[in-house]
């Protein structure tokens, strides 16, 4: 898949997930997305954004995952900053999502790996065809960390801020998070909620 095809897929994907939006608004969104220069398409910004921002990728964060039997284990990996940039300034804690390597694992078959690469899963995001394209961001494993600890580790070079998202990458992140966290529930469940009101 080349950049042009990927951009077209993203445009169609965005329109599918917001079906209730008026068609004229959808068309204007389509046109706005087409303004991205596909010859310069990049997930990452070449400009320093001046601090920790939403969508930044950090090189090594000690996540803790839990197994079915209740046992926990450490999983040091790259992380994406999920907290809104304004919240990062004001809050004591920062939300980070782990980047999970998936190419060298038997967790996914080849079709599932292709679907990950093409961003077909709601709760996962892949920065396809990039230097971190062999990872996916897992929105179901977001964890909270002390902001000052993270900032101090960056300032002391114990953690490296590897990448900041470009405008395109940031819009894509917002789209994926909107789908995962704010999509409408199935009709039956929604109707049941209404009965209990």
Where in the sequence are the language-model features?
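Pocket-edge structural micro-motifs
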Residues: 62, 98, 141
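C-terminal terminal-subdomain/extension
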Residues: 1-51, 65-74, 107-197
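Short acidic, S/G/P-rich loop/turn micro-motifs used as interaction or catalytic elements
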Residues: 63-67, 86-89
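Compact nucleic-acid interaction/catalytic patches
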Residues: 72-120
């Amino acid at each position: 898949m080349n950049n042009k095809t990927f951009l077209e897929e993203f445009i169609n994907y965005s329109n599918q997930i917001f079906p209730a939006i008026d068609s004229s608004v959808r068309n204007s969104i389509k046109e706005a997305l087409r303004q991205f220069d596909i010859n310069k398409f990049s997930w990452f910004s070449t400009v320093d954004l001046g601090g920790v921002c939403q969508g930044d990728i950090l090189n090594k964060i000690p996540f803790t995952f839990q197994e079915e039997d209740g046992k926990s284990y450490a999983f040091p990996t790259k992380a994406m900053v999920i907290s809104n940039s304004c919240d990062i300034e004001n809050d004591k804690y920062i939300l980070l999502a782990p980047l999970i390597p998936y190419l060298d694992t038997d967790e996914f078959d080849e079709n599932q790996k292709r679907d990950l690469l093409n961003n077909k899963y709601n709760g996962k995001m892949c920065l396809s065809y990039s230097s971190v394209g062999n990872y996916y961001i897992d929105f179901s494993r977001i964890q909270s960390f002390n902001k000052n600890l993270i900032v101090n580790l960056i300032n002391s070079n114990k953690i490296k801020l590897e990448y900041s998202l470009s405008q395109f990458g940031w819009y894509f992140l917002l789209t994926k998070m909107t789908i995962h966290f704010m999509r409408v529930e199935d009709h039956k469940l929604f109707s049941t909620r209404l009965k209990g009101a």
